Each structure stands twice: as C-alpha cells, then as structure tokens.
C-alpha cells in the first residue's frame, strides 16, 4: 500500500512540475518567461501559505490577470511598505 501511495504521489508531483506554456494556452510565451512567471506563482502559493488554489488563480489567463500582479506585489513586499505608518512632518 505504501508503494502505491508513493507512486501516486510521485506522479502528482511530476505532473505539477512538468507544466509548460502550451498547457495553459500560452503559445506565444517563451519557455524562460513562462518558467519565471510560474515560479512566482509557486512561491506565492507555497511560501506565503496560500496553497494550490492561489497558484491556479495566479496562472489564469496566461499570467495576464490582475491576480498575477498582486501575487508579484506580495512577493516583493509592496503591501507591507504601503501599510507602514508615516510619522507626521513637524
């Protein structure tokens, strides 16, 4: 049973990692650009703790959706900088 679980889990990991531009309909996107954008989505979903749904939404519309830009902003700590209170000038 453990071997079967391991094989299924391994296939799942390989299928997630083996995604390419054509799989998302990004036929005009070079592989290097796709890999960079896909890595951003993976970081956003996994490192920020939002999970696979976040990764999927980030990839929507071949990374052209506003959700992708929000994910990049989150990784670049844009929101945290905006939320820091600025002391009043004297």
Curated annotation (Swiss-Prot):
Expression (tissue specificity): Expressed by the venom gland.
Primary location recorded for the protein, binned into one broad class: secreted
Keyword Signal in annotation: yes
Top-level taxon: Eukaryota
Keyword rRNA-binding in annotation: no
A cellular component term, taken from the record's GO annotations: extracellular region
Subcellular localization(s) per the UniProt record: Secreted
Keywords: Secreted, Signal
Residues making up the signal peptide according to the UniProt record: 1-18
Coiled-coil parts of chain: none
Family under the similarity heading: Belongs to the arthropod CHH/MIH/GIH/VIH hormone family.
Extra remark: Co-purifies with alpha-latrotoxin.
Function: May increase the toxicity of alpha-latrotoxin and/or other venom components. Is non-toxic to mice and to the cockroach Periplaneta americana.
Protein name: Alpha-latrotoxin associated low molecular weight protein
């Amino acid at each position: 049973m453990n071997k079967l679980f391991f094989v299924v889990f391994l296939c799942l990991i390989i299928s997630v990692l083996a995604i390419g531009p054509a799989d998302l309909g990004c036929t005009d996107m070079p592989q290097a650009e796709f890999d960079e954008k896909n890595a951003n989505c993976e970081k956003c979903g996994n490192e920020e703790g939002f999970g696979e749904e976040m990764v999927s939404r980030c990839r929507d519309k071949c990374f052209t959706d506003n959700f992708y830009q929000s994910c990049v902003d989150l990784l670049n700590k844009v929101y945290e900088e905006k939320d820091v209170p600025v002391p009043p000038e004297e």
